[in-house]
Amino acid sequence: MSFNHREIEKKWQEYWEKNKTFKTVDDDDKPKFYVLDMFPYPSGAGLHVGHPEGYTATDILARMKRMQGYNVLHPMGWDAFGLPAEQYALDTGNDPAEFTEKNINTFRRQIKSLGFSYDWDREINTTDPNYYKWTQWIFLKLYEKGLAYMDEVPVNWCPALGTVLANEEVIDGKSERGGHPVIRKPMKQWLLRITAYADRLLEDLEELDWPESVKEMQRNWIGRSEGAEIRFEVDGHDETFTVFTTRPDTLFGATYTVLAPEHPLVEKITTPEQKAAVEAYLDAIKSKSDLERTDLAKEKTGVFTGAYAIHPVTGEKLPIWIADYVLMSYGTGAIMAVPAHDERDYEFAKKFNLPIKEVVAGGDIAKEAYTGDGEHINSDFLNGLNKEEAIKKMIEWLEANGKGQKKVTYRLRDWLFSRQRYWGEPIPIIHWEDGTMTPVPEEELPLKLPKTDKIKPTGTGESPLANIEEWVNVVDPKTGKKGRRETNTMPQWAGSCWYYLRYIDPHNDKQLADPEKLKKWLPVDVYIGGAEHAVLHLLYARFWHKFLYDIGVVPTKEPFQKLFNQGMILGENNEKMSKSRGNVVNPDDIIESHGADTLRLYEMFMGPLEASIAWSTKGLDGARRFLDRVWRLFVDENGNLNPKIVDNPETDTLERVYHQTVKKVTEDYEALRFNTAISQLMVFINEAYKAPVLPKEYMEGFVKLLSPVCPHIGEELWEKLGHNNTIAYEPWPTYDESKLVEEEVEIVVQVNGKVRAKLRVPADISKEKLEQLAMEDEKIKEHIAGKTVRKVITVPGKLVNIVAN
């Protein structure tokens, strides 16, 4: 007999909703546990089976911790600004707000149907003005402290789409959507000074319980390098340029220099003879993205400017080239080229026939650049020194002679914070006709997005908000001065930078959150989500959190103490699930056919949480069969409790396996090893089927252990066991170490490596006694009759191997 999942799941979901079973109360004395999911972007496609994998993992933790006596904060909300909704609005003429609301309703219904124990009274939505009021407030604080500023920066401008695109949205010089040409052009944009926090973002990673791979990605993204800045004069011009290098020790090997095509000197120093060639080159590379330009596999291109730089030590003239592999946005936009000891410079020098001068011994520069350490040669006062010594000595020389200094640089750039889009948070700044700008006063927040049907991009590089005259134009009531509101909106990252703080106090209209509540709940204890957010979201959220710490809003330096990335669920054919491949599995269908508990159990049992694993309908059926077996063990044909379940039986049946199960399941849940915990639950059920009676205490303990994974069947069986309250706050089972020990063990006896007998013996038997019992066994006697026993190998608790011939 199997159970009716539709009836049971509906019954308990209604019960939890009606009784607000999972409402979190702030003022209690229990220890806190804050477990967080990366909140989803509510797309038109709805939830897919990948979402519940992470959500089930956090739900198991939340449910177990409640039963262990913790006060648990486990919330859900919506990261609802973003390009797809705007694109939909452009394609259909419908309001993105309506589209978003409809999608959120679908997501909420789907998530509730999976039985997650969220406190829905704390639900947030980044597009709600009561929420983005505080996103805007944080922006104003950043502006006040000089961390939000405007600057001319080269951006990816797509004339056809009439907007600026992020680097991720440009592929091979064309827009990801529609394949339109993209060019680089300078435009005034808002930036946030994340670079001011580079060192702290780097150093504080050490204190976090995060996957090493994610920490490493953040370290690389921040990209701290130590070296020197060196000044070069331009021959015949009153101009200088600066290069940054991590290898100032190789300065004597510099044979030419390279400027980025966008470098302001290019125009000033190019000779008349080279002008046409330089202009043609600049035109040819205009549409390339930074990623493409720095691709190591691509062939190097460049052009000579006709001008020369003066070597700061030797006074030699070094030709100045321009090449697209040097980026204006990285370092100083200029490099000194040392082809003998740098692979890219070597390739470039070979292609354009430029001199290659060896200054570090140890390689064969006729074949390739030598990038290792070695003794310095052809280097005047550095000769004979190794790399470390030579770097130190060269920096001392540069500083003493006013030609350069020690310098630390970062790969990290300031964060480009404006989007020429409608569907985002308005930036609360007013630009006045006299060229000044002022922030919108705090008491006027939120500055709301106006409702409009004019969502088409303007084509001027401004957002569609520029079309809405009555919103854009303002007059200062005191002075009569005219102004225009900032028309750029914030990127989707803004709302997700701080959402975990708002869950703590979601209805506060006086402040971002009550400081006492923040002190109680921060930091987040466990944060689970996809690895695709390893760098940007997590880095931006850490930056905002550190800023809020500096201005006294939050009490901790870091937002997320432990981070875990779940793997991906692939299609049955091991490919990524996608609409175009037609291999997407919809959770609604599975809940209908197999039930939410089965889906939750299957996704946790598929394999390790961090692994990417293919979906299997067979595996799903297996999960359902296990739950049917559990049901039949507890409930008889008539729907009553199995009469084998009794209070205080006179036997220690199931005692050892029960205590082992409590220990293993508890430890595995804590460590997010859900697949092995479920295996142990299966072991217990197999043993229980063999038992003559079922002690009620153990059966109740089993239901408690199962309930975080399969909460609906957990509640139903708890009720069948005679309880009329929810299982959600029942105390978590405990185990007794002394009951884990096996009294008897099975020993394998081998003759010449082949198994010939098995013995049940006391677990604490001595080695001598064990060997004696093995030799006296009838089957063993047969196999060694007439042979000489050469040696006996005994592994206590495991085996005896008799070598005889």
Swiss-Prot record:
<keyword id="KW-0547">Nucleotide-binding</keyword>
<dbReference type="InterPro" id="IPR001412">
    <property type="entry name" value="aa-tRNA-synth_I_CS"/>
</dbReference>
<feature type="short sequence motif" description="'KMSKS' region">
    <location>
        <begin position="576"/>
        <end position="580"/>
    </location>
</feature>
<dbReference type="Pfam" id="PF08264">
    <property type="entry name" value="Anticodon_1"/>
</dbReference>
<dbReference type="GO" id="GO:0006429">
    <property type="term" value="P:leucyl-tRNA aminoacylation"/>
</dbReference>
<dbReference type="GO" id="GO:0005524">
    <property type="term" value="F:ATP binding"/>
</dbReference>
<dbReference type="InterPro" id="IPR014729">
    <property type="entry name" value="Rossmann-like_a/b/a_fold"/>
</dbReference>
<dbReference type="GO" id="GO:0002161">
    <property type="term" value="F:aminoacyl-tRNA deacylase activity"/>
</dbReference>
<dbReference type="InterPro" id="IPR025709">
    <property type="entry name" value="Leu_tRNA-synth_edit"/>
</dbReference>
<keyword id="KW-0436">Ligase</keyword>
<feature type="short sequence motif" description="'HIGH' region">
    <location>
        <begin position="40"/>
        <end position="51"/>
    </location>
</feature>
<keyword id="KW-0030">Aminoacyl-tRNA synthetase</keyword>
<dbReference type="InterPro" id="IPR013155">
    <property type="entry name" value="M/V/L/I-tRNA-synth_anticd-bd"/>
</dbReference>
<keyword id="KW-0963">Cytoplasm</keyword>
<comment type="similarity">
    <text>Belongs to the class-I aminoacyl-tRNA synthetase family.</text>
</comment>
<dbReference type="GO" id="GO:0004823">
    <property type="term" value="F:leucine-tRNA ligase activity"/>
</dbReference>
<dbReference type="InterPro" id="IPR009080">
    <property type="entry name" value="tRNAsynth_Ia_anticodon-bd"/>
</dbReference>
<dbReference type="Pfam" id="PF00133">
    <property type="entry name" value="tRNA-synt_1"/>
</dbReference>
<dbReference type="InterPro" id="IPR002300">
    <property type="entry name" value="aa-tRNA-synth_Ia"/>
</dbReference>
<dbReference type="GO" id="GO:0005829">
    <property type="term" value="C:cytosol"/>
</dbReference>
<feature type="binding site">
    <location>
        <position position="579"/>
    </location>
    <ligand>
        <name>ATP</name>
    </ligand>
</feature>
<protein>
    <recommendedName>
        <fullName>Leucine--tRNA ligase</fullName>
        <ecNumber>6.1.1.4</ecNumber>
    </recommendedName>
</protein>
<dbReference type="Pfam" id="PF13603">
    <property type="entry name" value="tRNA-synt_1_2"/>
</dbReference>
<keyword id="KW-0067">ATP-binding</keyword>
<dbReference type="InterPro" id="IPR015413">
    <property type="entry name" value="Methionyl/Leucyl_tRNA_Synth"/>
</dbReference>
<dbReference type="InterPro" id="IPR002302">
    <property type="entry name" value="Leu-tRNA-ligase"/>
</dbReference>
<keyword id="KW-0648">Protein biosynthesis</keyword>
<dbReference type="Pfam" id="PF09334">
    <property type="entry name" value="tRNA-synt_1g"/>
</dbReference>
<dbReference type="InterPro" id="IPR009008">
    <property type="entry name" value="Val/Leu/Ile-tRNA-synth_edit"/>
</dbReference>
